[in-house]
Amino acid sequence: MVKVGVNGFGRIGRLVTRAAICSGKVEIVAINDPFIDLNYMVYMFQYDSTHGKFNGTVKAENGKLVINGKPITIFQERDPTNIKWGEAGAEYVVESTGVFTTMEKAGAHLKGGAKRVIISAPSADAPMFVMGVNHEKYDNSLKIVSNASCTTNCLAPLAKVIHDNFGIVEGLMTTVHAITATQKTVDGPSGKLWRDGRGAAQNIIPASTGAAKAVGKVIPELNGKLTGMAFRVPTPNVSVVDLTCRLEKPAKYDDIKKVVKQASEGPLKGILGYTEDQVVSCDFNSNSHSSTFDAGAGIALNDNFVKLISWYDNEYGYSNRVVDLMAYMASKE
């Protein structure tokens, strides 16, 4: 089992740790966060307002974080070049601070002895992989990779199934997205993105997202055919993608349902889900799929123009894919 270090113990850092422990696919051996001391880590890992209390044991012992009896080395370095990943036994590092998202910045972890870095965010220059879509293109000459964004992980598997079966001529995506840590509790300054600084709990906030364009990087045939935007809404977790697209081959909505259901039970099992239930966002909290197609919510204008709806737990689904990507990479060593 590959040994992993986590840099940044925020929402994704903590949930990647939780997903790793719950799945047993990779082993967390080290965590670095300069802003959270050991006792605070115990508390933050144990109690989670969104996903509930951790179902296991967590304590601080001999300067280490001990989860379910396994000690994890703790670092508190601001400069990633100073983190001694190698000494802690970490072969891979999850870069989940949201700060070191380029090849150059994420590459700092290699200096401390890590063999590979997985950026848990989109990257301007690191190759992006989406499980179930293009992960098989990974080869072990790559030292730094990106797991793309939670929204790209939701959209890409659905877009792949639709494109493989019917062909997508062009499409527009909207994600209705839960609040994240980058937003403000009340109105405040927010750099160049003025709207993003408005109170998160009070507003529906139009925002930009690179998620749809990024699909073109993981499915090259769709490059230039998709774009989209986001609405940030006052819910704490779970988001939904609305993909409106023009199809090359005409298809009845029932045909679309059929191929998505088949994919969800076959090649994309565990990644793309399918439901015909009368679901709402809360029903997907702590769901580990990247994307769950909502058969009852979509609608067709005609056989070539459809709106498709797919839900995702933007925290937990994504964190599980980070773990899956690392497990896949380890299988190629």
Curated annotation (Swiss-Prot):
Pathway: Carbohydrate degradation; glycolysis; pyruvate from D-glyceraldehyde 3-phosphate: step 1/5. It is found in: Cytoplasm, Cytosol; Cytoplasm, Cytoskeleton; Nucleus. It catalyses: D-glyceraldehyde 3-phosphate + phosphate + NAD(+) = (2R)-3-phospho-glyceroyl phosphate + NADH + H(+); S-nitroso-L-cysteinyl-[GAPDH] + L-cysteinyl-[protein] = L-cysteinyl-[GAPDH] + S-nitroso-L-cysteinyl-[protein]. The modification Phosphotyrosine is found at Y40. D-glyceraldehyde 3-phosphate binds at S149, C150, T151, T180, T209, G210, R232. The [IL]-x-C-x-x-[DE] motif is a proposed target motif for cysteine S-nitrosylation mediated by the iNOS-S100A8/A9 transnitrosylase complex. Belongs to the glyceraldehyde-3-phosphate dehydrogenase family. This is Glyceraldehyde-3-phosphate dehydrogenase. It comes from Mus musculus (Mouse).
